[in-house]
């Protein structure tokens, strides 16, 4: 796949990819970020695509996986932040065991 062919694909399919990411992430900026990341991954891995006629579904799958990874990362970050609210052993007054 040439860079010109990829650019044409992006021009044609970007809207569909953003809608797909929006259905998962429910936030326009996150959806745009997911699509940008997915398109970078697709370009870097373009040699792995065996059938050019499967390009649309292949990039859609990369987009879905990227969006889901973003959700998992966000949940991990929220968990770490919520753990900061719990007192440590020293702050709780309990002796160390």
Question: Where do the protein language model's features map onto the residues?
Answer:
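Acidic, proline/glycine-rich intrinsically disordered inter-domain spacer in sigma factors
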Residues: 8, 78, 85-97
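A short, mixed-charge helix-start or loop-turn motif at secondary-structure junctions
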Residues: 1-4, 20, 24, 89-92
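A short, charge-rich alpha-helical start-of-domain segment used by transcription regulators
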Residues: 1-19, 29, 35, 43
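Short, structured helix-loop boundary elements
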Residues: 3, 7, 28, 32, ...
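Arg/Lys-rich amphipathic alpha helix in sigma70-family domain 2
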Residues: 50, 61-81, 95
């Amino acid at each position: 796949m040439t860079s010109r062919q990829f650019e044409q694909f992006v021009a044609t399919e970007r809207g569909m990819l953003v809608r797909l990411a929006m259905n998962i992430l429910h936030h326009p900026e996150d959806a745009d970020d997911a699509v940008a990341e997915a398109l970078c991954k697709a370009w870097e891995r373009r040699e792995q695509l065996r059938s050019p006629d499967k390009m649309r579904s292949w990039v859609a799958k990369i987009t879905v996986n990227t969006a889901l990874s973003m959700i998992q990362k966000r949940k991990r970050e929220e968990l770490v932040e919520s753990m900061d609210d719990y007192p440590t052993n020293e702050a709780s007054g309990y002796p160390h065991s």
